[in-house]
Swiss-Prot record:
It comes from Lachnospira eligens (strain ATCC 27750 / DSM 3376 / VPI C15-48 / C15-B4). The active site is at residues 82, 169, 171. It is an enzyme of class 6 (ligase). GO terms for cellular component: cytosol. It catalyses: XMP + L-glutamine + ATP + H2O = GMP + L-glutamate + AMP + diphosphate + 2 H(+). Its EC number is 6.3.5.2. Keywords: ATP-binding, Glutamine amidotransferase, GMP biosynthesis, Ligase, Nucleotide-binding, Purine biosynthesis. This is GMP synthase [glutamine-hydrolyzing].
Length: 524
């Protein structure tokens, strides 16, 4: 992609993808590379700026990730963050040692507003520290431009060479004015114009697809999820009916989801493509009969998808390209294990190439983060209910039904889940209308699951012996940890009443308060 870019060099820190996302929020394109990437390759990319990330090591120890002095002599602005700041000082002649006082968490920091990084930042600001080493002596040519009560060098700069070292993490939200600092570096120091915008990305990607595909045929497995839907939209805009999408409806989707996907991508939809819907519900239910173990269910669902897709692919015949909804985090995670100096091409194919007759993979979203994929979807005109769809597991409702999966159990969980999500969405919308903002309790993910427990109840003066539905709602930033959402009790009461009255086969509703850990977000 021929455009101005900033390169993030990864040293193993936990926030590295976040750094790249923050740079892109400044409308500047950014890519992540391993610290092992050859200097000549970095130079050949002609970056407008370089950012060195944090990492878990001590830069003065043998075997620690490092870089050459020549990196700082390219004539390109360099910003070091945490470990990256320490490494910059260490390589250029400063001194880094174990800190007499470690700093973790929110820390009051005093900055020199004459610095280009802090010109519009408050003189006293809150930043996020996370370090056990510190810069005890700055390198020649540097000037200290920020400090804390326990850290004499919270930031240093060498304006002559446009080198900047920051001991804290401006990329995390806990650093109150971190976005300003990164903006000042990327747009100010580096001089980036800020031309990375989604409308331009969509337009350029469509051109690139047309050039690459030519008159060739493309095959895409369309799940109805965000990534494959946006990939389908991009490809359709570029090559029309040269694209064939195979949508396998395994009967384990949310209520009406299969029809929603077809309404957008099918013959009556807004996209010009060949759409094949395979209704394989009974086939899946038959394979899952009597199976109760979660991993066994996952395996059956995955293997059956392969078989169904294989059958359809054989009917279609040879194609030139197999398209995938690979996104940038997949690419980054495949290439930063230390085995490759450059991020490797990531083929998230899951066994498909063995039986699909194709020449090459095409991944139109491989440069985008998840939030950018959603923006691209909106730019393409894909309906919001698809673009902002909640996370949904690959095995679908198969792992939201505890125990054996049957058609009747699928009906129960589909109906209960639809009611639950509808009522939560309604409550959120009403709050937004009244208050002009989303409620603090608004969950990041919420769904209903069917337990394997039946119990006695009384409905209409008659004894019942029916299933219990569990409601799950969590608040989370990264889905690695999560807390149960505090949905208002009156909303939960309405949900409970509707489920018991409207969903045949249910006489109890539970609300799951378990955090992650010890629990997981999904039930199986």
């Amino acid at each position: 992609m021929d455009q101005e870019k900033v390169i993030v060099i990864d040293f193993g820190g936990q926030y590295n993808q976040l750094v790249a996302r923050r740079v892109r929020e400044c409308n500047v394109y950014c890519e992540i590379y391993s610290y092992k990437t050859d200097l000549a390759q970095i130079k050949a990319m002609n970056p407008k700026g370089i950012i060195l990330t944090g990492g878990p090591n001590s830069c003065y120890e043998d075997g620690a990730p490092t870089c050459t002095k020549e990196l700082f002599e390219l004539g390109v602005p360099v910003l070091g963050l945490c470990y990256g700041a320490q490494l910059m000082q260490h390589v250029l002649g400063g001194k880094v040692e174990k800190a007499p006082v470690r700093e973790y968490g929110k820390t009051e920091t005093f900055v020199d507003k004459s610095s280009a990084l802090f010109s519009d930042v408050s003189e006293k600001t809150i930043v996020w520290m996370s370090h056990f080493d510190y810069i005890s002596q700055i390198a020649p040519g540097f000037k200290i431009v920020a400090h804390t009560a326990d850290c004499p060098v919270a930031a240093a700069e060498c304006t002559e060479k446009n080198l900047y070292a920051i001991q804290f993490h401006p990329e995390v939200l806990h650093t109150q004015e971190g976005t300003k600092m990164l903006h000042n570096f990327v747009r100010g120091v580096c001089g980036c114009a800020g031309t990375w915008k989604m409308d331009a990305f969509v337009e350029n990607t469509i051109k690139e697809i047309r050039e690459k595909v030519g008159s060739g045929k493309v095959l895409l497995a369309l799940s109805g999820g965000v990534d494959s839907s946006v990939a389908a939209g991009l490809l359709s805009r570029a090559i029309g009916k040269q694209l064939t999408c195979v949508f396998v409806d395994h009967g384990l989707l949310r209520k009406d989801e299969g029809d929603e996907v077809e309404s957008v991508f099918g013959p009556e939809g807004q996209f010009d493509l060949n759409f094949i819907r395979v209704n394989a519900q009974e086939r899946y239910y038959s394979k899952l009969a009597g199976v109760t173990e979660p991993e066994a269910k996952r395996k059956i669902i995955g293997e059956e998808f392969i078989r169904v897709f294989e059958e359809e692919a054989k009917k279609i015949g040879a194609v030139d390209f197999l398209a995938q909804g690979t996104i940038y985090p997949d690419v980054v995670e495949s290439g930063l294990g230390g085995e490759s100096a450059v991020i490797k091409s990531h083929h998230n194919v899951g066994g498909l190439p063995d039986f699909v007759d194709f020449k090459e993979i095409i991944e139109p979203l491989r440069n985008l983060f998840k939030d950018e994929v959603r923006k691209a979807g909106l730019e393409l005109g894909i309906p919001e209910h698809l673009v902002f769809r909640q996370p949904f597991p690959g095995p679908g409702l198969g792992i939201r039904i505890i125990g054996e999966v049957t058609a009747d159990k699928v009906r129960i969980v589909q109906d209960a889940d639809f009611i639950y999500r509808s009522e939560v969405d309604k409550a959120v919308a009403e709050y937004k209308k009244a208050n002009g903002k989303a409620p603090a309790w608004m969950p990041n993910q919420y769904f209903a699951a069917l337990t394997n427990m039946r119990s006695v109840g009384v409905m209409g003066d008659e004894r019942t012996y029916d299933y219990a539905v569990a409601l799950r709602a969590v608040n989370t930033i990264d889905f690695m940890t999560a807390e149960s959402a505090e949905i208002p009790f009156e909303v939960l009461q309405t949900v409970m009443s509707r489920i018991i009255n409207e969903v045949r086969g249910v006489n109890r509703v539970f609300y799951d308060l378990t955090s992650k850990p010890p629990g997981t977000i999904e039930f199986e």
